[in-house]
From Swiss-Prot:
InterPro entries: Aminotransferase_I/II_large (IPR004839), Asp_trans (IPR000796), NHTrfase_class1_PyrdxlP-BS (IPR004838), PyrdxlP-dep_Trfase (IPR015424), PyrdxlP-dep_Trfase_major (IPR015421), PyrdxlP-dep_Trfase_small (IPR015422)
Catalytic activity: L-aspartate + 2-oxoglutarate = oxaloacetate + L-glutamate
Swiss-Prot/TrEMBL cofactor(s): pyridoxal 5'-phosphate
Classification via CDD domains: AAT_like (cd00609)
Gene3D superfamilies on file: Aspartate Aminotransferase, domain 1, Type I PLP-dependent aspartate aminotransferase-like (Major domain)
Species, as recorded: Medicago sativa
Top-level EC class as recorded in UniProt: transferase
GO cellular component, one term: mitochondrion
The EC number(s) this enzyme carries: 2.6.1.1
Residue list for modification N6-(pyridoxal phosphate)lysine: K264
Protein name: Aspartate aminotransferase 1
Gene name, Swiss-Prot/TrEMBL: AAT-1
Tissue specificity remark: Nodules, roots, stems and leaves, in decreasing order of aspartate aminotransferase 1 concentration. Is the predominant aspartate aminotransferase isoenzyme in roots.
Something else known: In eukaryotes there are cytoplasmic, mitochondrial and chloroplastic isozymes.
């Protein structure tokens, strides 16, 4: 038979062409959930991944999101055609308005280019690749610490990653002097990654007065700010308050980038909905920026998905839906603030060694506990509490029922291991 004369492919041999590969380590954040899922303990607690949970420990789909999805389902005029490379026009326009403000001069002067992205991660990656191709300085400064994915995203985009001091372990607060010194010595034109609010993983944010000093330094050094806005409205409960740092930088007429995510504030984690906005000096430059962003996006994923962006656009453009969303958003933020207070009170009631006031001073989804890797390991092995090795816990994963268990465990490990 003809098939008997076919020369065997090299891949048909016993050794795979990929046999040289070593097993990659689990993602340090997502790996926490992998370990948690394998634990049969009935008291196990997952405080690793940044996803909101109800008081019952269940994932939450916002009521306003469910209502909009029903509307979309019943709209027979909708189809599943490709959308433009830059995404849904309404979504982009409304996303820019949400982060910059309805009266933003940059929007009114057509100096803002907004493209729909694959949540925050995808928006950061598109921004990073755009800068690597079209910006003269390929250095980006990240705070220490920062979200674990930032370094990989920007390295793979073609940028050189450097760091600036941010967190002060001794005070469990902001190392403001270190931040100013490091950015002050950065090469002119360097890109600076800034967490717009609710810094991940520390929960430590600059005050507005400190933000103004940061702005002055960045502008005086001709540095280019790149904001990561993953928690707008989720930090304080106010969409406008959480956008103030970004708006400070827009008000001075300078240029900047912002990546937005709707994972947290609309609970659309799995829909991968985000946006990248670039503020330029003129409408003409902004138009050219958009044309080049299309060339970054087209070979990467061609065009973004339609469903999640349609949900966001529907909520942002309808006054009643928008108001209902802000109520649900504030309820989520308030529950997290309440969990902070409960945990602080529980530790204080036990007389746990150390100052734990940082738990109620920090903001947003995460708390940087100050626990060291050895203490974290004991929490996991003996108390079935899962968190990242740097001591970051997701306050959204706590409930009134689980706070006592966590407080007892923290008290035990800090008493036993310094």
């Amino acid at each position: 038979m003809a098939s008997q004369n076919i020369t065997p492919s090299p891949t048909a041999s016993s050794d795979s062409v990929f046999a040289h590969l070593v097993r990659a380590p689990e993602d340090p954040i997502l790996g926490v959930t992998v370990a948690y899922n394998k634990d049969p303990s009935p008291i196990k607690l997952n405080l690793g991944v940044g996803a909101y949970r109800t008081e019952e420990g269940k994932p939450l789909v916002l009521d306003v999101v469910r209502r909009v999805e029903r509307q979309l389902l019943n709209d027979m005029s909708r189809n599943k055609e490709y959308i433009p490379i830059v995404g849904l026009a309404d979504f982009n326009k409304l996303s820019a308005k949400l982060i910059f403000g309805a009266d933003s001069p940059a929007i009114q002067e057509n100096r803002v280019t907004t493209v729909q992205g694959l949540s925050g991660t995808g928006s950061l990656r598109v921004g990073g690749e755009f800068l690597a191709k079209h910006y003269h300085q390929r250095i980006i400064y990240l705070p220490t610490p920062t979200w674990g994915n930032h370094t990989k995203v920007f390295n793979l985009a073609g940028l050189t990653v450097k760091t600036y001091r941010y967190y002060a372990p001794a005070t469990r607060g902001l190392d403001f002097q270190g931040l100013l010194e490091d950015l002050g010595s950065a090469p002119s034109g360097s890109v600076v990654l800034l967490h717009a609010c609710a810094h991940n993983p520390t929960g430590v944010d600059p005050t507005l007065e400190q933000w103004e000093q940061i702005r002055q330094l960045i502008r005086s050094k001709s540095l280019l700010p790149f904001f990561d806005s993953a928690y707008q409205g989720f930090a304080s409960g106010s969409l406008d308050a959480d956008a103030q740092p970004v708006r400070l930088f827009v008000a001075d007429g300078g240029e900047l980038l912002v990546a937005q995510s709707y994972a947290k504030n609309m609970g659309l984690y799995g829909e991968r909905v985000g946006a990248l906005s670039i503020v330029s000096k003129s409408a003409d430059v902004s138009s050219r920026v958009e044309s080049q962003l299309k060339l970054v996006i087209r070979p990467m994923y061609s065009s973004p998905p339609i469903h999640g962006a349609s949900i966001v656009a529907a909520i942002l453009k309808d006054r009643d839906l928008y108001n209902d969303w802000t109520i649900e958003l504030k309820a989520m933020a308030d529950r997290i603030i309440n969990m902070r207070q409960q945990l602080f009170d529980a530790l204080r009631a036990r007389g746990t060694p150390g100052d734990w006031s940082h738990i109620i001073k920090q903001i947003g989804m995460f708390t940087f506990t100050g626990l060291n890797p050895e203490q974290v390991s004991i929490l996991t092995k003996e108390y079935h509490i899962y968190l990242t090795s740097d001591g970051r816990i997701s306050m959204a994963g706590l409930s009134s029922k689980t706070v006592p268990h966590l407080a007892h465990a923290i008290h035990a490990v800090v008493t036993r291991v310094a």
